[in-house]
């Protein structure tokens, strides 16, 4: 697709599916191959009864990729897409991993106590530390902590539900980020997902590494 092939959706419909995720899913399935904007997603995600706009629509969008296996592309994937533009090129879904398990209530309380009721995500020596009920300064919306397998679910879906050492507390944004780091089909690092998530300089650094590795020049 080049910039002249971009076809924008003119979908201004409201959607009445039960959940935010289902409403966003319906929007994309009704507009396959068309560019959908942030405002269209928010409109579709809005509760049809109360008119309330969801804070966490972006997380539900990411879950359509990671949990349901849809291909939804953004500017990180295609240069012709501007920020806040998305496209679902087809409705084919990748296979899902085995059903997830959750820690027991007692185990989860121990995890939260260890974490001081804050997100335990660590990256480049930086600790997230967002507390339940905070407003996420990057992703927006109210922080809700949920349990995450220390070992990726795709590698060991039968994590011990009674062992707090096997679990960590993550905010919604970092739950999605971790899912993007791992390929649920084979339990290996999702290199493409990581490259999509990094900034332009890091993409160029990766390109330079590969060019040097293969003895090529720009």
Swiss-Prot record:
Transmembrane segments: none annotated. Keywords: Endonuclease, Hydrolase, Nuclease, Restriction system. GO terms for molecular function: type II site-specific deoxyribonuclease activity. It catalyses: Endonucleolytic cleavage of DNA to give specific double-stranded fragments with terminal 5'-phosphates. Disulfide bonds: none annotated. One of its GO terms (biological process) is DNA restriction-modification system. Its EC number is 3.1.21.4. It comes from the Bacteria. This is Type II restriction enzyme KpnI.
């Amino acid at each position: 697709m080049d910039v002249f092939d971009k076809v924008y959706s003119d979908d201004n419909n409201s959607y009445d599916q039960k959940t935010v995720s289902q409403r966003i899913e319906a929007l994309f399935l009704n507009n396959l191959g068309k560019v959908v904007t942030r405002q269209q997603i928010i409109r579709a995600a809005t509760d049809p009864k109360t008119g309330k706009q969801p804070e966490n629509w972006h997380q539900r969008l990411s879950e359509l990729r990671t949990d349901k296996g849809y291909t939804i592309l953004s500017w990180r994937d295609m240069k012709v897409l501007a920020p806040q533009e998305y496209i679902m090129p087809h409705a084919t879904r990748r296979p899902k991993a085995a059903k997830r398990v959750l820690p027991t209530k007692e185990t989860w309380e121990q995890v939260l106590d260890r974490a001081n009721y804050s997100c335990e995500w660590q990256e480049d020596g930086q600790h997230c530390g967002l507390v339940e009920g905070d407003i996420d300064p990057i992703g927006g919306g109210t922080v809700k902590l949920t349990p995450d397998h220390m070992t990726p679910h795709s590698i060991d879906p039968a994590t011990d539900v009674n062992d707090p050492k096997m679990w960590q507390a993550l905010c919604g944004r970092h739950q999605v980020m971790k899912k993007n780091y791992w390929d649920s089909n084979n339990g290996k690092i999702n290199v493409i997902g990581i490259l999509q998530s990094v900034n332009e300089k890091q993409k160029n650094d990766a390109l330079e590494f590969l060019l040097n590795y293969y003895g090529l020049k720009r």
